[in-house]
Curated annotation (Swiss-Prot):
Subcellular location: Cytoplasm
Name the UniProt record assigns to this protein: Putative ATP-dependent RNA helicase C550.03c
Annotated positions binding ATP: A302, H303, T304, S305, A306, G307, K308, T309
Superkingdom of source: Eukaryota
Length: 1213
């Protein structure tokens, strides 16, 4: 076939025109004849389609057709994308359809930058654990957000009755739309019979109307086959919460469990335990485990050492069984480290997250502080997807003024799939708190409380070297013991010389020059003076406890300084044998082996080494972290017999002793000295008594000069613990984090706070009342449809204003000297009280009992037989209404009575003063009442001259005179109103008043449940103005660059530090100087030593003060109440560790930097660790800004300070 093709080509005569056309399929050597190979190649090339046409061919082939333009398509409905879909709401295991709701359609490209849904794509691996400030937080609760969006308050603020937005972003108000009936209009929109399909031609689409859907739902049980077509293929059998089934009943989310009753069938309820325990569980533990197995959230409140950790451990085991994660949060980092060690022994896959440590961050059990979890939630960390349980330990720290807000934020922000486990000491309002958590998360919370202690306590007073029992193990206060202690205290002292202290003066002077000992010596008196005062007390007390076999003992001292002083009084006391000394030596050597040689020689380590070998120790915030951990480990092993500790030791892992001693019953709370609260006493005393070892625990209260009174002791020992009180407050970081996303408004966060719990709990009831009032108002308006009440309403408003001005006049008058004389004995008054009809009375002297909002006066009043209100009682008591008042009160059968009335109920103070027997009336003597009745015998109506108003001209008060003038104007206005003389005036006035009252009730309740009634809303608006003034947000409250930088700052003052970063103020300082300057953002302790700094650092210090003053001036201008937000650099010693941090960054040893200040070593370490966190946040801020030089600088600063003992790994790791 190919040869025939070649022959055909050879016969073709190629013309010039053809050569041009075939230019693309032949070469220059073509002479009119082709070989077989060439012909085959050219034919294949010619027949093979080219990927592109030549320009000449395109010009020849392109053609444009003219078409007629039509506008009919503009009248058609466009094909729109469905943004929502209708989902059925089901209930019960059978999935019974109970209703339907409209839900948004999912967007295909969901990611952490545009969606808060759990269906979004995961972010990068680097952001899995910590998240990013550019991420959107996961939605806290879909149903709750829907409920909030549907509240009347939100609709009034943003939406019209038809659900359409009316307030554009940035506008304070929207369009003023005329009121319409939502239901009627909505039904009209969905009524196909009312659609005019002739006017509009729409595309062929099948609509399912609401009416059709409702008909299907009505017949769901009888016509099951018809509904099958509408059912989705995958049926969900998830049970809906009760709130979706009964909209009129407010669900009770908190359920109190009776933990005193034993669970006989626990094995049947939980046949396969996720974690087996080697001991018999208590009832409250069984209850908690059962509810965890059922997927419920629990709130466990029990005494210290009662076994709450069992619940936490079981939740961790359950998470591992379900292949999910459990997060354990604690108030402080040290507690997280301790729990990490304990959990590591029981569970394999355990991790910990702190500011500077990240161990196994993808473990099934993660330990962290509550602040770290809050940061993860705001940053939308993907790790949250896998979390099944969050365990909040020491929940009673929600009462903490500074950090309590963190607990509330985390609970509010947690996703709905997370099960909550709340562990707390015993508090009186557990149900109230659980109810708030349940309402916020739409979860049932089971409250499991136990007042039973595993080891009962006995309480003693230590007086004159003797113990006097004042409370026995059954909780009974022993008055005989208290009297005996009091009698012993009153006996004269015998001079006693403490032989144990002859060499104690050498204690700390020989150890070191500055730091701990020097600081201790600088207090109020030297160590010697303290020893002379307290030596005998502690020597005899410890000797007595040793003889009575009551060691180990924890002595709670509410001062770091006195902890050191008291232990110095026991210099010659040795409580450990040789074997115990050897064990102590091994533990210490093993612990300090991780330190550099120079750090092992620190005076504090040497001092504690000697002290621990004798079985003595101290534990407070001034110790190095490694020293505190050594003390804790040795105490748990029973190698510390006497421990002087501050109250922070009472919080945390189980470290019980045989006895507990209180060095006093007062503490300084930062403002003044006060008695210990019952909760604080209970928390500390709970360390007494070792479960399984001691029959009872011993608690001793030290008494030196005088005993506390019995009432104080009873309250402290046996009184209820402090209630959980909300410490929720707004911070700039919280506001900016919520403004950058749209899923949760600040108003919603405030509504969900514990502080708004009472108000928000009443919202459903108020909504029901509003609905009821609206129905009554609608019926009333139909009844009044034929009556023109325009003039009546004008008269009514004037009457109500008259009443208000009268009340204001009386309240102002009674606060002045001349006005008070008017309210004298015998003065005639006209008054009404609540539902009591208008009547007359006589004041009995000037005996006035005043409270915050009203005054109470003694009167003799005319008591009618029928005291129900009459139509004329709705009118103000003004002369204009004299002809329409009901005068039935003056019937001769009515008698006078004695009583108390409120000042707010007085309608007129009359000019008449009667001579009465006040004492006889108070004593209810009949003669006194008869004489009074005789003086009123001739009075028949209110228009009598007897009721002429008193002359107020002697009252000299501006507000009184202002109200008096306005009331006179209204009096004249009412007198000239002809409507008063019409025949049906009272009837029409009563109808108008009823309408006015219903409308007022609706407005008041609507205002009560609206956002404008939120307690913290004014503070929010003021902080918004501050942020706008500083340029963190714009007029539409969109977060700007400054705001995004401030979102990175969590551990200190975000405003001041952001200003420094964006003004590039730190660029002129070296890394060491930057470290010194930033130390001012984390140091907040007292110091008497002024740091020595260079002129350049002094310039930087003045720069920080200048920026802080600028920020504070703006806050003061907008009246922002800032509490402990780190903005006060002037009045607080914020710059006390500048020299220390500067030299540390330059490489000076820790031993030498302690000589530069009187601040304790532990406080120095804590400051540098917090400084590292600030540097890390500054590095993140530099990344947001795009400043690579600053990013590198902050990284270098971190490397300079992260060394040696300051960043020594925890012994618990």
């Amino acid at each position: 076939m190919s040869s025939k093709l070649v022959d055909a080509i050879n016969e073709v005569a190629v013309s010039n025109k053809d050569k041009i056309e075939l230019d693309g399929i032949k070469d220059d050597s073509f002479d009119g004849h082709l070989s077989i190979t060439e012909a085959t190649y050219d034919v294949d090339t010619f027949l093979k389609p080219s990927p592109a046409l030549s320009k000449d061919w395109i010009r020849k082939l392109q053609k444009k057709w003219d078409r007629e333009i039509t506008y009919k398509g503009l009248y058609e409905y466009p094909e729109t994308l469905a943004r929502t879909q209708i989902r059925f709401q089901r209930h019960g295991l059978e999935g019974k359809i109970m209703g339907y709701k409209e839900v948004p359609e999912l967007i295909e490209d969901l990611n952490s930058k545009n969606s808060s849904s759990f269906l979004r794509k995961p972010s990068s691996k680097n952001e899995f654990v910590r998240g990013s400030t550019s991420n959107i937080p996961f939605l806290a609760d879909d149903s709750d957000v829907d409920a909030i969006a549907g509240e009347p308050s939100v609709k009034m603020a943003l939406y019209g009755e038809d659900g359409l937005l009316q307030v554009p972003p940035g506008f304070s108000r929207g369009l003023s739309m005329t009121a319409t009936s939502t239901t009627d209009n909505l039904n009209d929109e969905f009524d196909p019979e009312k659609w005019d399909t002739k006017k509009v031609k729409s595309s062929n689409r099948n609509f399912v109307t609401i009416h059709e859907l409702n008909e299907h739902l009505k017949n769901v049980n009888s016509k099951h086959s018809e509904i099958d077509d509408l059912l989705p293929d995958k049926r969900s059998i998830v049970s809906l919460p009760p709130s979706t089934l009964n909209l009129h009943k407010q669900p009770d989310y908190a359920h109190v469990v009776d933990s005193s009753a034993p669970i006989e069938n626990f094995q049947q309820l939980v046949p396969e335990m996720a974690l087996d325990f080697p001991f018999e569980l208590d009832n409250f533990q069984k209850e908690a485990i059962y509810h965890l197995e059922m997927g419920d959230s629990v709130f466990v409140a029990a005494h210290t050492s009662a076994g709450k950790t069992v619940v936490a451990e079981y939740a961790i085991a359950l998470a591992q069984k379900h292949m999910t994660k459990a997060i354990y949060t604690s108030p402080i980092k040290a507690l997280s480290n301790q729990k990490f060690r304990d959990f590591k022994h029981k569970f394999e896959d355990v991790g910990i997250l702190t500011g500077d440590v990240q161990v196994n961050p993808e473990g099934s059990c993660l330990l962290m502080t509550t602040e770290i979890l809050r940061s993860m939630l705001y940053r939308g960390a993907d790790l949250i997807r896998d979390v099944e349980f969050v365990i909040f330990d020491e929940v009673h720290y929600v009462n903490d003024l500074e950090r309590g807000v963190v607990w509330e934020e985390v609970i509010i922000m947690l996703p709905p799939h997370v099960t909550l486990i709340l562990l707390s000491a015993t508090v009186p309002n557990t149900k109230e708190f659980a109810s708030w958590v349940g309402r916020t998360k739409k979860k049932n919370i089971y409250v499991i409380s136990t007042l039973k202690r595993p080891v009962p306590l006995e309480h003693y007073l230590w007086v004159k070297q003797n113990m006097f029992k004042i409370v026995d193990q059954h909780g009974r206060f022993l008055m005989d013991g208290y009297k005996s202690a009091n009698d012993a205290l009153k006996k004269p002292d015998k001079p006693v010389i403490a032989k144990d202290n002859k060499n104690s003066a050498r204690g700390r002077g020989a150890a070191r020059g500055r730091g701990v000992q020097t600081n201790m010596m600088r207090g109020r008196g030297s160590a010697k003076s303290v020893e002379r005062r307290d030596a005998n007390t502690w020597v005899h007390l410890i000797g007595h406890l040793h003889k009575q076999n009551l060691l180990p003992v924890i002595v709670f001292v509410f001062s770091k300084k006195r902890c050191e002083e008291y232990v110095d009084t026991l210099t010659n006391r040795d409580l450990n044998n040789h074997q115990e000394k050897s064990e102590v030596h091994v533990v210490i050597e093993k612990a300090v082996a991780r330190l550099k040689k120079e750090d092992r020689l620190l005076p504090q380590i040497g001092r504690m080494r000697e002290m621990l070998s004798r079985g003595l120790a101290v534990h407070h915030g001034g110790l190095l972290p490694i020293i505190k951990e050594i003390v804790e480990i040795l105490f748990q092993r029973g190698l510390v017999k006497v421990l002087f500790a501050t109250e922070t030791f009472a919080m945390g892992v189980n470290m019980p002793a045989k006895s507990v001693v209180f060095s006093g019953t007062q503490k300084h709370d930062g403002r003044n000295f006060r008695d210990l609260l019952p909760g604080e006493y209970t928390q500390c005393s709970g360390r007494a008594g070792r479960r399984g070892l001691d029959v009872t625990g011993t608690v001793i209260i030290l008494s030196r000069s005088e005993l506390p009174d019995t009432a104080s002791l009873r309250h402290m020992i046996m009184g209820p613990s402090s209630k959980l009180i909300s410490q929720f407050r707004l911070t700039y970081n919280m506001i900016l984090n919520l403004l950058r996303v749209e899923t949760l408004r600040i108003e919603d966060m405030i509504k969900r706070s514990f502080s708004e719990n009472v108000n928000q709990t009443l919202v459903p009831q108020h909504e029901e009342k509003i609905k009821s009032f609206e129905e009554k108002l609608s019926a009333l308006k139909k009844e009044m449809s034929d009556v023109d009440l325009k003039e009546i309403k004008s008269c009514l408003l004037s009457s109500e204003s008259f009443k208000e001005y009268t009340k204001k006049m009386h309240f102002r008058a009674i606060t002045t000297a001349n006005g008070k004389r008017i309210f004298k004995d015998g003065r005639v008054i006209v008054f009404q009280q609540l539902d009591f009809t208008r009547t007359v009375g006589v004041l009995l002297g000037t005996s006035i009992r005043t409270n915050a909002s009203d005054c109470t006066l003694e009167v003799a009043y005319l008591n009618p037989q029928n005291n129900l209100k009459r139509p004329s009682d709705l009118l103000a008591f003004a002369d204009a209404f004299n002809d329409v008042y009901d005068n039935a009160i003056f019937d001769e059968s009515n008698q006078f009575k004695y009583g108390l009335i409120n000042l707010s109920g007085i309608e007129r103070v009359c000019n008449t003063i009667l001579r009465i027997d006040s004492g006889g009336i108070r004593d209810r003597r009949g003669g006194a009442f008869r004489k009074l009745s005789e003086q009123f015998a001739s009075i028949k109506k209110f228009s009598d001259l007897l009721f002429e108003e008193v002359n107020w001209s002697k009252v000299r008060d501006f507000e009184f005179c202002e109200a008096f003038e306005k009331r006179n104007f209204l009096q004249n206005k009412l007198s000239g109103n002809p409507i008063i003389s019409t025949p049906n005036f009272l009837t029409h006035f009563a109808l108008a008043y009823q309408e006015y009252e219903l409308e007022s009730n609706i407005d008041n309740l609507s205002s009560y449940i609206s956002d404008q009634n939120l307690e913290l809303l004014p503070d929010y608006e003021q902080r918004i103005k501050v942020l706008q003034e500083l340029g963190y947000i714009d007029a539409e409250r969109t977060v700007l660059l400054k705001g995004r930088v401030a979102c990175e700052i969590n551990s200190t003052s975000e405003l001041v530090l952001t200003e420094l970063i964006l003004e590039n103020s730190l660029a002129d300082f070296s890394c060491e100087e930057t470290i010194a300057l930033l130390s001012a953002f984390v140091f907040d302790e007292k110091t008497e030593v002024e740091p020595t700094i260079s002129p350049h650092l002094q310039k930087g210090k003045e720069m920080i003060l200048s920026v802080a003053e600028k920020v504070n001036q703006i806050q003061e201008h907008y009246q922002v109440l800032y509490f402990n937000e780190g903005n006060d650099f002037e009045s607080q010693p914020r710059f006390g560790l500048m020299e220390v941090c500067y030299e540390w960054a330059r490489g000076m040893s820790f031993n030498r930097i302690t000589d530069l200040t009187d601040v304790l070593e532990g406080s120095i370490v804590r400051t540098i660790i917090r400084l590292d966190e600030v540097l890390r946040e500054c590095r993140g801020a530099a990344r947001v800004v795009g400043d690579s030089s600053m990013y590198t600088k902050m990284e270098e600063c971190q490397n300079l300070i992260r060394r040696n003992i300051v960043f020594c790994p925890s012994l618990y790791m």
